[in-house]
Amino acid sequence: MLVPAGLALGSNSDKKPMSTQTLPNAISGTNATASASEASARPWYDIVQATLKRNDVKLVAYVPDKVFTPLIKNLHADKDFLAFATAREEEALGILSGAWMGGRRGAVLMQTSGFGTIPNALASLVVPYQIPAIMFVSERGTLGEFNLGQALVCRTMRPVLESLAVEHHTITRHDELEFIVDRSVKQSFATQAAVAFILSPLLTAGRVFEN
């Protein structure tokens, strides 16, 4: 057997002790676990804010909502964002549409009941004129809801989005939030089509869990 010069069979002199830090993540899992822990330590609203900023979505209209309060406060405190309240949700969609035509990207925050005000704005403006409206809906009407009005809109919200061919995602898991929002926002602007993110109480610990 030929042995390359300088290499002695059976010698461990040139070998370094193996460390789990040098192993791929798929084997050691150390870095992957650390990353997962860091992600889970971030509140959902921080993830949404960071993802919007990364995708240059800097204009955010909203109708005040308790679930979205921490996100709204953070947006107002961040000089990179222009956040403002509107009287109704369809007004917010109109402003977003005008902003898009003027070269700005925007999002709207609303509660489930507020979604009931926007089907006409979606059907007559956002969808036919290909406005990539980014919509976040704090979900009410399920998991112990006490308000019948919220429950009725919750039952019809997804069928309305389906009938208008508006992509929508119901997000229940913290570890899926960033990926779903980031990729869907990118797709929304690339295809010029609206997208709705329905944030489950399982994600936000929303109002239905207060009682």
Predicted segments — roles?
Residues M1-T30:
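N-terminal amphipathic/basic-hydrophobic helices that include classical n-h-c signal peptides
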Residues S19-N211:
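Thiamine diphosphate
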